[in-house]
Amino acid sequence: MAPAPCGRSSQRVFHFGKGKSEGNKNMKELLGGKGANLAEMASIGLSVPPGFTVSTEACQQYQEAGRALPPGLWAEVLDGLRWVEEYMGAALGDPRRPLLLSVRSGAAVSMPGMMDTVLNLGLNDQVAAGLAAKSGDRFAYDSFRRFLDMFGNVVMDIPHALFEEKLEAMKKAKGLKNDTDLTATDLKELVSQYKNVYVEAKGEPFPSDPKRQLELAVLAVFDSWESPRAKKYRSINQITGLRGTAVNVQCMVFGNMGNTSGTGVLFTRNPNTGEKKLYGEFLVNAQGEDVVAGIRTPEDLDAMKDVMPQAYKELVENCRILESHYKEMQDIEFTVQESRLWMLQCRTGKRTGKSAVKIAVDMVNEGLVERRAAIKMVEPGHLDQLLHPQFENPSAYKDQVIATGLPASPGAAVGQVVFTAEDAETWHSQGKSVILVRAETSPEDVGGMHAAAGILTERGGMTSHAAVVARGWGKCCVSGCSGIRVNDAEKVVKIGGNVLREGEWLSLNGSTGEVILGKQPLSPPALSGDLGTFMSWVDDVRKLKVLANADTPEDALAARNNGAEGIGLCRTEHMFFASDERIKAVRQMIMAPTVELRQQALDRLLPYQRSDFEGIFRAMDGLSVTIRLLDPPLHEFLPEGNVEEIVRELCSETGANQEDALARIEKLSEVNPMLGFRGCRLGISYPELTEMQARAIFEAAIAMTNQGVQVFPEIMVPLVGTPQELGHQVALIRQVANKVFTSMGKTIGYKIGTMIEIPRAALVADEIAEQAEFFSFGTNDLTQMTFGYSRDDVGKFIPIYLAQGILQHDPFEVLDQRGVGELVKLATERGRKARPNLKVGICGEHGGEPSSVAFFAKTGLDYVSCSPFRVPIARLAAAQVLV
């Protein structure tokens, strides 16, 4: 009886009890995750305390009515209560047959700890006396005391501290350490004091009518949906589109009724390792919150075998039933009341990456799930964990966290602090592990960034230079850490009250953004045999190819090892920073006043480029390599510093005089360089630049072919906005190809295509496709130009936009499907109309983001290209879209 996807259900209250349920596991949207699973457990015959669920739709109606109960709902709740009373042979508010209730929230998506719970509802003076006659004074008044505290805090908004003060004062007066040491008389006195707290805090007495308690508790759960912490959690976890929370009203069962009672929490498999063995904790003579609050140290679940063998045996069987039923590892809460087992909750258990892969593979091998179902059991984030080093024990360093920035590139790094790229390279060459700390990074820092174990920056967002480069290399990076102040001159960094000097140890958690003092122990990436098995299943299912962005032979090899099927983006400019000789030659080319002098500088660069391409072609033997011609504005290749320093360095490196150097710098200076003299505009203005790069590519390709390497070069022209721009560059490249083929006596196949990163190019894609054999969407620049956001400055306002709901996601991290995605669709359709066999892919940062990859797969792209370390994640996302 799953609800229709549209419209509203007339039924708003659903009963459940052993063997009887009005709901099922498919009704999460209506009953919330907890309510749907309680109904399911009851319907398959497990011992679930009976109760009823008030639907998420009722919560939505309550919010829409300005926080007023919808007409008729209270009568339906009372009908539900009567059903539970008849089932249990007890009644709410009856001292002779007392029924106590728990009232819990439960949205369609698990939001642990985000909503409010009330236990032991239904107690007042008369019911407590009746309960004491049945179960003893201590139990009755301890339950009453807990209820007054919880109800006061959750429902009446009385600070928990006011109750805690009374409890601590009594323990101090009696010379006691633990709550459990209080006598029944002490607890009765506490009940009296807690009631006074209501009068003092609210000016009214505690509501002793149990039905009024129930009504107020239901309203409190509805209200908690809009509490600041719940809204914040939904925002952080990008949870949208839910109706509200359901309310689960359930008969209380007690684990604190002596040594034949207890409570526990377990996972049906180990959530850290995936081992097929129950993993959990158990407390004798305790209520559920005692485990959660850590008041007493729980015992390992195995201890339950000895003290409650029958209940343990039933629990093991229930776990088997639930795993077989849900076909997933389960997280279970249970209580034993006087030797009788009760199942309180089950949900899919959260797990580590290592555990997720092992459980998926094991369940297929056990015949529990099919391979396609197993592919859905592993989240992209799980693979991310497996591919980066992690801290051995993150909880151990919590008191050493001195700042938190943006988690720009996952993993963990430990090293000695250095402040310049040069120092990072020097120290690294001496075998030292370093953390490069910069105010912000620039392309000139890439050598030091590559040498560093991790990168920490004061400024810059999740898509800043540091973040993008670090992710590409699988390096840990924490960016935009506003709590730090970097002083390059003195080589110190101030972090909060700490001052760290060069050489001091620092640890970074790129998955959380934490900056940690000292040298924390690391464990290497856990690449197990199960991962290889799992990824082979992934590759059998997916249709979308996954390529990698790689600029060096080392990157290309890493990409291939991670399952890349080619190189979708090789950025030639990164090669120019690889050595001093190269960057000097680039600067001579920039400073050259004549074509002849510029050609001389390019001739010096040619062998470097050719050798790099040979290395990449060799690493990618048998696979395609897409090489992007020079893209960034030329000023990025100039030295850093003030104008005088730049002029001095250029003069010494290139032999130019000061006047010429200054004039050249002024000419290269741009108001908006990202929209300025870059991309194909450089190749058109300086055709010899395109000629040199094309020649290096073709000469390298033929040299490798002569060595028996299979080479498939694809040349990509960047920042094209008109078909004429592309036509100019295509003609030039073909001329160079013919010259090289003639001089080397050999011909090879190659393709020429373009980046689609200017909105106009997407709109005239049909005309551009007449010249281009492939399109590759540069979604970083396409997003920048479509939104009109500067990628380097969005950090100033994106957090505000996300907090206020103006944007749901940072568009540089998650593709904006409605706007930028529409341009991708349009360009793909128009391009293929003009050239039906047009190869279409994407090489922006979005190529490794799971929801974006799913969109590209649905849109009919041939491939995505992402950083080498995100290749397995993109492979998984491409498969998950089809299962």
Swiss-Prot record:
Subcellular locations according to the entry = Cytoplasm
Q: Provide the residue positions that the database annotates as binding Mg(2+).
A: E757, D781
**InterPro entries in UniProt:** ATP_grasp_subdomain_1, PEP-util_enz_mobile_dom, PEP_util_AS, PEP_util_C, PEP_util_CS, Phosphohistidine_dom_sf, PPDK_AMP/ATP-bd, Pyruvate_phosphate_dikinase
Disulphide bridges in this chain?
none
Q: Which GO terms describe its cellular component?
A: cytoplasm
Q: In which tissues is it expressed?
A: Expressed in leaves, roots and stems.
Q: Region (Disordered): which ranges?
A: 1-21
Per UniProt, the keywords (alphabetical) are: ATP-binding, Cytoplasm, Kinase, Magnesium, Metal-binding, Nucleotide-binding, Photosynthesis, Transferase
Question: Per its UniProt record, what Pfam families does this chain match?
Answer: PEP-utilizers, PEP-utilizers_C, PPDK_N
Residues annotated for substrate binding in this entry: R571, R628, E757, G778, T779, N780, D781
Q: What class of enzyme is it?
A: transferase
- A single GO BP: photosynthesis
According to its UniProt record, the EC number is: 2.7.9.1
Name the cofactor(s) required for activity, per the record. Mg(2+)
Catalytic site: H465, C843
Catalytic reactions of this protein: pyruvate + phosphate + ATP = phosphoenolpyruvate + AMP + diphosphate + H(+)
Q: Which GO terms describe its molecular function?
A: ATP binding; kinase activity; metal ion binding; pyruvate, phosphate dikinase activity
Q: Which family does it belong to?
A: Belongs to the PEP-utilizing enzyme family.
Provide the function of this protein: Formation of phosphoenolpyruvate, which is the primary acceptor of CO(2) in C4 and some Crassulacean acid metabolism plants.
Q: What else is known?
A: PubMed:1668653 shows the existence of a second gene coding for both cytoplasmic and chloroplastic isoforms of PPDK.
Q: What is this protein called?
A: Pyruvate, phosphate dikinase 2
